[in-house]
Amino acid sequence: MSAAGVRSTRQRAAISTLLETLDDFRSAQELHDELRRRGENIGLTTVYRTLQSMASSGLVDTLHTDTGESVYRRCSEHHHHHLVCRSCGSTIEVGDHEVEAWAAEVATKHGFSDVSHTIEIFGTCSDCRS
């Protein structure tokens, strides 16, 4: 087991190594295709299961695109949110005290406690607008 409580396997190591080389979010299919291109013989189902396990352990970020597809990226170590371009998929991590304060205020207003949240904001980046 690793520090995050995830069992270490050859497949998990290959997926983790690949994710470390990428800056952007990728679908399980895209990751599977890249692993095969690199000579890794890992089934698509194994890629999906491994990504789910890594996401549950906080090792990868999962983002649901506006089309409903799940995409994955190596997780930053700090709490953050995402701005996502609908056109090119470019993603920017944002951490903002105002977002955290707003989330806490809304939760308190509605009687919630022990709250966690994820926020994904979709729009069009400046490069795609040009």
From Swiss-Prot:
Keywords: Cytoplasm, DNA-binding, Metal-binding, Repressor, Transcription, Transcription regulation, Zinc. One of its GO terms (cellular component) is plasma membrane. GO terms for biological process: negative regulation of DNA-templated transcription; positive regulation of DNA-templated transcription; regulation of secondary metabolite biosynthetic process; response to zinc ion. Induction: Induced by zinc. Repressed by SmtB in the absence of zinc. Its main location: cytoplasm. Zn(2+) 2 binds at C85, C88, C125, C128. Global transcriptional regulator involved in zinc homeostasis. Represses the transcription of at least 32 genes, including genes involved in zinc homeostasis, by binding to promoter sequences that contain a conserved 26 bp palindrome, in the presence of zinc. Homodimer. Belongs to the Fur family. PANTHER family: FERRIC UPTAKE REGULATION PROTEIN, ZINC UPTAKE REGULATION PROTEIN. This is Zinc uptake regulation protein. The lineage of its organism: Bacteria, Bacillati, Actinomycetota, Actinomycetes, Mycobacteriales. The gene is zur.
